[in-house]
Amino acid sequence: TVISGLTVVLPNGDIINTGSRTKKTSAGYNLTNLFIGSEGTLGIITEVQLRLSPIPESIMSAVCHFPTLENAVQTAQQVIQYGVPIARIEMLNKDQMGISINYSKLKDIEAVPTLFFEFHGSEASNNENIKIVEEISKDNNGSSFKWAKDLEERNKLWKARWDVYYSVKALINNGRVYSTDVCLPISNITECVNYAEEQAKKFGLRAPMVGHLGDGNFHVLLPFDPENKETYKKIREFNDLLINKALELKGTITGEHGVGLHKKEYLLKEHADNIPLMKLIKRSIDQNNIMNPGKIFDLN
């Protein structure tokens, strides 16, 4: 699914339509992406025009266990580097696998770093690509490779992945989950993932982890009691270190969740040279600063 256009209400009340119904366009500035990335600071999006993808002839899923996170990440890197057509590559670390297994009462599955694959295409092409991914996984010490094409069986294979958030939240009575959101070049994921686990241990924090390895994004899901200020302070310090490490490794402070209120200081580190231009755009469209004031950056 691709967003091809928007209807936006501007701060002065004007209504504009961005994008086009055509498959591609080079007409003018890409206002669609500008408003999507503005986090509501430039206007109110009232309509979204979507270009839907056709449902694949066949969808297949697979899982594979690995002795180390390095093995799992290397497998994902090689699958991408070899150009294997794949829809999704998700990763759970050892801690998250153990949490999911306990929460969902899963059987015949190990609490070790695990990759979850999804393939879209014809049945013949999916079968061929599964064989290739299985071989790559085995070359990286992967084991217990399983795959399925039936929807019910696919959901069973991915059950540990689907229950990630609720399994972590259930660790603490009335607890909450703080999610990190760094994204890196795929070649640098291993170093950052290992760093995250090492720093979590130093802080005495549990660090269940889910990664969208196909695009270099991963989240450390940190459970905490909202009444425990000391733990929350440790989590914020941990996140600070992780973000700075990601920037050091040519990554970004947020792959999906956005800047909002709490990552403004890190945006200064990542895009200091670009912020004056962002402010210029903001002032030209929203002179009275009425659209999400204080989000992304402070005007003054």
Regions from the PLM with identified roles:
Residues 1-90, 291:
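FAD-binding subdomain of flavoenzyme oxidoreductases
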Residues 4-24, 70, 187-194, 226-237, ...:
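A short, flexible low-complexity segment enriched in Lys/Arg and Gly/Pro that occurs
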Residues 14, 263-300:
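Activity-critical C-terminal alpha-helical subdomain
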Residues 15-35, 198-201, 236-250, 279:
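Short, hydrophobic/aliphatic alpha-helical segments
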Residues 40, 220, 286:
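Conserved, mostly hydrophobic/aromatic
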Residues 95, 213-217, 253, 258-265:
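Small/polar glycine-rich anion-binding or flexible loop at a beta-alpha turn
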Residues 247-259, 272, 287-291:
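Alpha-helix capping/hinge segments and adjacent helical runs
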